[in-house]
């Protein structure tokens, strides 16, 4: 992390021991806000208007041609965007090696950080924020600009907690009917067509991201996430996500209409504005009128604020040069002072609501005087004697190496030195007996010295787990791979897993509900057991379940909270589509934390599918995990399968193959406890498609069915043909007497009383237990 002191030491020989502030042009640098690989963001204050700004300092020497073009395009887009909910561009300064972008400073930071610290928003708060986001995105689309990286990290909050849309690095121009083909964005917020590598319409891409953003605002978690990018890609393509119980039906409907897999069937911005959830608060409809807020910002069209121009002229700034800068969109010092003063004027009006009823000619002189009294213009800009422009921005002097190491990191020593220099706070000696020309006052004083230096280091962020509460509706789950010899794995294979959902749908995948679910149900088979956080008696906090972080970029694990609380019953307040999870399956484990920050990527279409990734993991499992067990002879055939044959399998075949490997592992682990048990020949028995009982104590398959060298696909196929007889519907059980080795479970059967080594599907209702058969 680059640390730069707010003040710099005075060069030796001055005879003064005080420290002097650093300055970039007309901006006094205060501190570092953040940095990346080739850029650093500084907080600075304009010396004339006393307004805080953010200066993004970019090292052009460390950018290739494509990234440099991206930076210039971002600047070009920001010059065209003048909206109260979009970060305002004030000034652009450029040297041979450096680029300085001065923008509006949002003092309350990112919406992402706000959610990680305070939890999810109420729907009323989320509606207000979403109206502002929608207004900014609609303004961009009306100007044929698509953002393509909408996420909570790019939504900033100003001093009034209003939204400011930022970071147009992936933005671009678009024309209706001409699709785009740059597959970029942040994976959790990216649309399905980006992962598939299809051409897309820009607005439809932003609407999908808007749906994810609204979900995050209301829920405090991501709708689509996964331990890796292939898993995340699969979930996005399926369009399935979970809805918490506290979300209203109208909000759920709006989110589902935005998160539609088929982009042609997604809701439009005009339809979003007319949605019932958006229209629930009439006061927000009256505030959504940017016409008044945009007064004075459309200066390139000749709409100038005469009040601001009068203030600048009173300060000695040439009016004609200011107007020319605004007309040409130069974004130099003249334009920067104009826009900063305009912002100050708006703040002054907002603090005096009664002034709107006063006639404009009567209050205009009062506002001008108040603005002039609060500007605190430095002494060097007052008219005196003529002076050389170099005195306003002298060439940087060489400082001692020890001073540089104590104040400026090695990266900023060379990259920022052309613009940073010690400034004497008492400028009376420099400008004594000299007059100042308004024209030379605002010349861009930037040194054109070349620079060389090492690369910038990345700043490490402090990662903190967030408190949360329980209570969430679960409609999708994964299979837990954590089991013990006494509790062998049960893998549920759904026939719809390998089938893509119908276009234009966004449905849940419901699992059977267990009426006897308790604290042990959700915590038994989790990689990180327990739940995080506490619940508020006033309003529900964000319901985070503690476990491994599902962010595909960082993949960090969550810590346990200070207090482990039992899960809230899912039976209270559930709608007809609400479901919960059976024991042994992973619960909903997404949470929005500081270490879950996502980054934008190019080439999301190059992410491999889930089937290929599962295949590779099965290869590693067969080579590493099986080597610790004394497996029977057929396992050599499983290990000898070539990679090329695995790559051609479908997702269902790979899941069956993994099920077979897990069964063999468990069978080998517990076989030593049953060496004296009689070996019973298997009896063909017809089961329903949902039957998934594992037999521990008898051979899993007859010896003739498992031959050395048999492929796992053929083994799984014979398993289905010989024993399961899976069909489209449930098959009736035989009415004759059952063999002695087979008994039917009674509804009152207690699973805890089973002999060691026996297993069954856990958390089943009484009606479901009657349809399963336990093999003893």
Swiss-Prot record:
Residue span(s) of domain UBA: 303-343
Biased amino acid composition, Polar residues: 628-643
All copies of domain Protein kinase, residue ranges: 27-278
Modified residues (Phosphoserine): 186, 577
Regulation: Activated by phosphorylation on Thr-182. Also activated by phosphorylation on Thr-322 in response to increases in intracellular sodium in parallel with elevations in intracellular calcium through the reversible sodium/calcium exchanger.
Induction: By high salt diet and depolarization in brain.
EC numbers on record: 2.7.11.1
Protein family (similarity comment): Belongs to the protein kinase superfamily. CAMK Ser/Thr protein kinase family. AMPK subfamily.
Protein name as it appears in the record: Serine/threonine-protein kinase SIK1
Record organism: Rattus norvegicus
Name of the gene encoding the protein in the UniProt record: Sik1
